[in-house]
Regions:
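FAD-dinucleotide binding site
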Residues: 1-400
Length: 400
């Protein structure tokens, strides 16, 4: 399946092949194509967007089953919002939610973030609430959080926005005119100084795609799973970086009710440590759409249940958060990113001792293989993916 123009037949050779049509892959292909290189994008799914996944067929409003927010008014994502002429709405509070760090000595290389903040004397209730979206602080590299500015990010007041007409609106400016092959799952990357040959499972059967260079924007879970084989194996530095990095799980449960259940003045019901849920109200119309979100250990607890029990747990937690009886939903849906074979988890996180791993993975492999996206930045945002694709391909073109 081709989105946009099909510039070449599969038997020909491209300047660059991009693996993955998520935001990082699309921004990489956009930058390369705009600079005159011949580019083909291969995507295992039957849609573009990767973990930006807008479901338009379930309820009366578009529902984000993956990424859902624009973080701050200065995010580069606003460039795409403007190009797509998309409307946005402000969501939730903009208050500072963690204490700024003093000016201390930097963390030790193998120190976890919880131990570091404890050593600085910062009360636990003022730590960055990263466990809402990811793993708890004791699983994070303090050195990486310090060096990447993540502690400062959480201590800075920041407004969040969503796109009510669907976050996937921002994909159109990136994908326009690109040669994108959907339902093309890469199984093997044969690489050498002469270029790459991809072994691909497509709907019409196995095929090969040849290019001088390859951009790889696969999620960390897929890279670690070994489902995509590199032949020959990646250099030791890249192999060790993949081993050191890890991924977390996340789960969204979406409910449609035939009457409003959320307080009129609230968009978000904050994280409850006991249930592990955050709740979002997506529509104040009849019907009303509510999203229950869990990540990390809370998501793993839920995914160990049956699907019915997951939905029941979400409703019970919502009733507790509202302190009232709520009606049965008229419709519901979910997406389990851990069981999604083309994701194999939700977000990346950087464990203690792995602070150098994203940069190591981002290093070009003999001017042929270029890794981009979340595993090379450690950033869990659409903005991070967007910037990574552009920055990474600027580096690629500088090598030409």
């Amino acid at each position: 399946v081709t989105v946009g123009a099909s510039f070449r037949t599969l038997g020909e050779r491209w300047d660059v092949v991009v693996i993955g049509a998520g935001v990082a892959g699309l921004s990489a292909a956009r930058n390369l194509s705009d600079h005159g290189l011949s580019v083909v994008v291969v995507e295992a799914r039957d849609r573009i967007g990767g973990q930006l996944y807008t479901d338009r067929g379930f309820t009366s409003v578009p529902v984000e089953l993956g990424a859902g927010l624009i973080h701050g008014r200065d995010a580069y994502t606003w460039e795409l919002v403007a190009e797509a002429e998309a409307e946005t709405v402000l969501v939730g509070p903009s208050d500072q939610i963690a204490d700024p760090l003093p000016t201390p000595e930097p963390p030790h290389d193998a120190e976890d973030a919880a131990a570091y903040l404890t050593r600085l004397g910062i009360p636990e209730d003022r730590w960055p609430p990263v466990s809402i979206d990811n793993e708890p602080m004791h699983r994070w590299s303090a050195r990486w959080m310090h060096d990447s500015g993540l502690f400062d990010w959480w201590s800075t007041p920041r407004e969040n926005f969503r796109v009510p007409d669907g976050y996937d609106r921002i994909l159109s400016p990136l994908a326009h005119g690109l040669d994108i092959r959907l339902s093309h799952a890469v199984r093997r990357v044969h690489w050498s100084d002469r270029g790459v040959v991809l072994s691909v499972d497509a709907l019409e059967g196995p095929t090969e795609i040849r290019a001088d260079r390859c951009v790889i924007t696969l999620p960390i879970g897929v890279l670690k799973s070994g489902d995509v084989v590199f032949s020959p194996e990646l250099p030791d530095d890249h192999h060790e970086a993949l081993r050191a990095l890890d991924r977390t799980d996340a789960l969204k449960l979406v409910y449609e009710f035939d009457r409003p259940v959320f307080p009129a003045e609230e968009d978000v019901l904050g994280w409850d440590e006991d249930t592990g849920f955050v709740f979002w109200c997506l529509s104040r119309e009849d019907p009303e759409v509510v999203v229950a979100w869990a990540a990390g250990k809370n998501a793993r607890r839920l995914t160990a249940m049956t699907v019915e029990d997951r939905f029941a747990a979400g409703l019970t937690a919502l009733a507790e958060a509202l302190d009232e009886t709520i009606p049965e939903p008229v419709a519901r849906t979910t997406h389990d990113w851990a069981m999604d074979e083309f994701s194999a988890g939700a977000y990346l996180f950087v464990p203690p001792g792995a602070h150098d791993a994203p940069a190591a993975l981002a290093a070009p492999v003999r001017g042929v293989l270029y890794f981009m996206g979340e595993p090379t930045t450690g950033e869990n945002t659409v903005e991070g993916a967007y910037v990574s694709g552009y920055d990474g391909t600027d580096l690629l073109m500088a090598d030409l």
